[in-house]
A protein has these predicted regions:
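Beta->alpha turn/N-cap motifs
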Residues: 42-47, 81-86, 97, 101-109, ...
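A ligand-binding cleft/hinge motif common to bilobed small-molecule-binding domains
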Residues: 86-90, 105-113, 163-166, 187-221
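Extended ligand-binding regions for polar small-molecule ligands
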Residues: 18-19, 24, 64-73, 133-136, ...
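Short helix-initiation/N-cap motifs at beta->coil->alpha
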Residues: 26-28, 64, 80-91, 137-139, ...
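Bilobed "Venus flytrap"/periplasmic-binding protein-like clamshell domains
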Residues: 40-48, 59-73, 128-181, 198-200, ...
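Periplasmic-binding protein-like
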Residues: 45, 124-131, 198, 202-245, ...
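Extracytoplasmic small-molecule ligand-binding "clamshell" domains
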Residues: 19-104
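Acidic, polar ligand-binding/catalytic clefts
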Residues: 68, 72, 77-144, 212-213
Length: 280
């Protein structure tokens, strides 16, 4: 589903789409959102198939559709606000406020929960790799990757870079600014490995025969993706959690997983726990 962007707030014009501190402190978040008729959603737009921004300004992806369902249940429209992995935390905590919540591939971690609010998980996740299909048999473990001759490419500021820095002491780690460009760079031979997620890897394998994800069924970590927001928005957090629970109960969350080719991890769980084994 492509969602037309009602208003795009560029990185150079956040002042036009910030939320006044007085209005935030004066009344509950949901009341403020419904009165203005719009929920502002921060998203990176670089993470297929969870959040991607097309050149014409439309957004699509699993997380974008979850955001759409939150807006639908609130009875408001959506305004997407660009953020990035290096600036995500700062953007959530910014004064004046830049957006109401952030969505799209954001892993639930203890560190994030210490300073911000995170919803229950709506998508299982874990670290894995992309490599060239011709070399898939070469990589059977993390030890096979952690060698000086292996070029490992990651995007800056997120958990992919953090995982690489903490677990790869010998590999040649290359930081590339645009996450969405890394798969094609691996396919072209400009890097050997991309550290990515089990949510992202299948999309690129399905769309590029030069790529493979040989460790997809053996992720290095196990976690959950959730919705991120600043502290003090407890009413909005409760509403988001209830939306996730209702989507599980009515089957719409399962259908979204099937639409995007993602593994549904909630068959025995009607109320998702954090299921988090990733600590920042």
């Amino acid at each position: 589903m492509l969602l037309a962007v009602l208003t795009i707030c560029g990185t150079g014009s956040f002042a036009s789409c910030t939320i006044s501190e007085d209005s935030v402190s004066a009344r509950p978040t949901i009341e403020r959102i419904t009165q203005k008729g719009t929920i502002t959603v921060g998203t990176t737009g670089d993470y297929r198939p969870l959040s991607f921004r097309e050149p014409d300004g439309t957004y699509w992806g699993f997380g974008i559709e979850v955001a759409g369902e939150i807006a639908r249940r609130l009875g408001v429209s959506i305004q997407f606000v660009p953020t990035s992995w290096p600036t995500l935390t700062a953007d959530v905590l910014a004064e004046p406020q830049k957006f109401d919540l952030a969505i799209g591939g954001i892993t639930i971690t203890d560190a994030r929960r210490e300073t911000m609010l995170m919803s229950e998980g709506y998508l299982a996740n874990g670290k894995t790799i992309l490599c060239r299909a011709s070399e898939a048999d070469r990589y059977k473990s993390l030890a096979d990757i952690d060698k000086p001759e292996v070029r490992v490419m990651v995007n800056p500021g997120g958990l992919n870079e953090k995982f690489a820095n903490e677990n790869l002491t010998h590999a040649n780690i290359i930081v590339h600014q645009k996450n969405e460009e890394i798969p094609s760079l691996v396919a072209k031979g400009q890097a050997d490995i991309m550290i990515t997620e089990i949510t992202e890897a299948p999309y690129y394998v399905q769309n590029d025969p030069l790529l493979a994800a040989p460790l997809l069924n053996e992720p290095f970590t196990h976690g959950m993706i959730g919705v991120l927001m600043r502290k003090g928005q407890d009413d909005l957090l409760r509403m988001v959690n209830e939306t996730i629970r209702q989507m599980k109960a009515d089957g719409s969350l399962r259908r979204l997983h099937e639409k995007y080719g993602l593994v549904y991890a909630f068959d025995n769980d009607t109320r998702s726990t954090h299921c988090n084994q990733i600590n920042e």
